[in-house]
């Protein structure tokens, strides 16, 4: 009997992507995050769909509809907590996935990397518009502050901001369109994920050594399906722990108050996963400069493949680059901390120094380290 999974037009695609896919024999747990992100996306879409059934995108009822979901809908509190904390898990996996790509030189698969950066931006946009929907104080003021940044664009800025708002300030029209965006974007993300995988399967996976693994490949199933399943269980364990025992620990207390345009919260700040970019934005006193730095902090990922100077792909055998990579990691944690602090000394100067170090590491120090390592590996007479 002919094996159906190898002949059926649809099953054949799944078979070549997840079952008989030749995978390097030495990929570590750092390669689990792709599948974990897939699981996160599915969880977010399913929980989001059930939330959308009960949510109303109107300024008068949005806040109370979220309260209604938590109080009156069967397991509504659980669905909402899973969705809110699922976003945090999503970004945690995203940052680790990108970090893995930088450490092991996966960015040299340029198409896959570029689609990945577009995916990151799309997920960030989705999370931003989603945070506005509960229409609490931080939702409203976060939306006001971030959309206001568009007005820094010369000539067309104010018009652009009012166009996004659908009026002269963040109001009913803004909330309605943000709900529409928040609903459609995850499906766009799903399409981009398929393109991301399509490009990845053109080249095959990278591996920790950075050496071409073609001479030693193993089938994806059962080796990596089992390994991924362990990752899913650990992810669900952490997510359920967060959602059941500490659902509000990553949120902002101000969001328990309904949005009030007449009362500004003392410290306006986004969710934790945007704090590093927010710190870079705030570290520049000029509004337009801050917006450009904010964009550059993410878009800099697009030029990382061009800054690769080392003869080796992976950082596995490059101690100088490794040191700089972990300094970059610590620097991003510092920026995340600074983003949540008030705008006063010493936080201002720490944020400015951390921002300078962030760009210096990626644009100058890491390429120089690659060149230095090449020089050190050259045979000397």
From Swiss-Prot:
InterPro entries: Cyt_b/b6_C, Cyt_b/b6_C_sf, Cyt_b/b6_N, Cytb/b6-like_sf, Cytochrome_b, Cytochrome_b_C_euk/bac, Cytochrome_b_N_euk/bac, Di-haem_cyt_TM
Bound cofactor: record note: Binds 2 heme b groups non-covalently.
CC terms in the record's Gene Ontology section: mitochondrial inner membrane; respiratory chain complex III
Pfam family, one: Cytochrome_B
Record membrane topology: Multi-pass membrane protein
UniProt keyword annotation of GTP-binding present: no
Binding site for heme b b562: 83, 182
Keywords: Electron transport, Heme, Iron, Membrane, Metal-binding, Mitochondrion, Mitochondrion inner membrane, Respiratory chain, Transmembrane, Transmembrane helix, Transport, Ubiquinone
Chain residues that bind a ubiquinone: 201
Molecular-function GO terms, alphabetical: metal ion binding; ubiquinol-cytochrome-c reductase activity
Example GO BP: mitochondrial electron transport, ubiquinol to cytochrome c
Record-annotated membrane-spanning stretches: 33-53, 77-98, 113-133, 178-198, 226-246, 288-308, 320-340, 347-367
Function: Component of the ubiquinol-cytochrome c reductase complex (complex III or cytochrome b-c1 complex) that is part of the mitochondrial respiratory chain. The b-c1 complex mediates electron transfer from ubiquinol to cytochrome c. Contributes to the generation of a proton gradient across the mitochondrial membrane that is then used for ATP synthesis.
Quaternary context: The cytochrome bc1 complex contains 11 subunits: 3 respiratory subunits (MT-CYB, CYC1 and UQCRFS1), 2 core proteins (UQCRC1 and UQCRC2) and 6 low-molecular weight proteins (UQCRH/QCR6, UQCRB/QCR7, UQCRQ/QCR8, UQCR10/QCR9, UQCR11/QCR10 and a cleavage product of UQCRFS1). This cytochrome bc1 complex then forms a dimer.
Assigned protein family: Belongs to the cytochrome b family.
Protein name, entry field: Cytochrome b
Gene name for this UniProt entry: MT-CYB
């Amino acid at each position: 009997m002919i094996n159906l999974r190898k002949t059926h037009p649809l099953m054949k695609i799944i078979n070549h992507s997840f079952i008989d896919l030749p995978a390097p024999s030495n990929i570590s747990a750092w390669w689990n995050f792709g599948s974990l992100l897939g699981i996160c996306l599915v969880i977010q879409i399913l929980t989001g769909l059930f939330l959308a059934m009960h949510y109303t995108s109107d300024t008068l009822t949005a806040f109370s509809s979220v309260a209604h979901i938590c109080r009156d809908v069967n397991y509504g509190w659980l669905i909402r907590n899973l969705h809110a904390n699922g976003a945090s898990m999503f970004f945690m996996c995203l940052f680790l996935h990108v970090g893995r790509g930088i450490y092991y030189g996966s960015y040299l698969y340029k198409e896959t990397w570029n689609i990945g950066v577009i995916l990151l931006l799309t997920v960030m946009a989705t999370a931003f518009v989603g945070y506005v929907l509960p229409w609490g104080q931080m939702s409203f003021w976060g939306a006001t502050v971030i959309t206001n940044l568009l007005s820094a664009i010369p000539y067309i800025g104010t018009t652009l901001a009012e166009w996004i708002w659908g009026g002269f300030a963040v109001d009913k029209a803004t909330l309605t369109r943000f709900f529409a965006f928040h609903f459609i974007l995850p499906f766009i993300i799903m399409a981009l994920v398929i393109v991301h995988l399509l490009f990845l399967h053109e080249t095959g996976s990278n591996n920790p050594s950075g050496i071409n693994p073609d001479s030693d490949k193993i089938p994806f199933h059962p080796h990596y399906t089992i390994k991924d399943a362990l990752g899913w269980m650990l992810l669900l364990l952490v997510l359920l722990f967060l959602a059941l025992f500490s659902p509000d620990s990553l949120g902002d207390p101000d969001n328990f108050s309904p949005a009030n345009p007449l009362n500004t919260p003392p410290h306006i700040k986004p969710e934790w996963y945007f704090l590093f970019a927010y710190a870079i934005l705030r570290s520049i006193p000029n509004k337009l400069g801050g917006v450009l730095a904010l964009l550059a902090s993410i878009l800099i990922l697009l030029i990382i493949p061009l800054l690769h100077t080392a003869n080796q792909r992976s950082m596995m055998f490059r101690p100088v680059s490794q040191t700089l990579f972990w300094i970059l990691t610590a620097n991003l944690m510092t920026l995340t901390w600074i983003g949540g602090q008030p705008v006063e000394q010493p936080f201002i100067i720490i944020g400015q120094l951390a921002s300078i170090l962030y760009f210096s590491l990626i644009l100058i120090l890491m390429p120089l380290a690659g060149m230095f390592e090449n020089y050190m590996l050259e045979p000397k007479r």
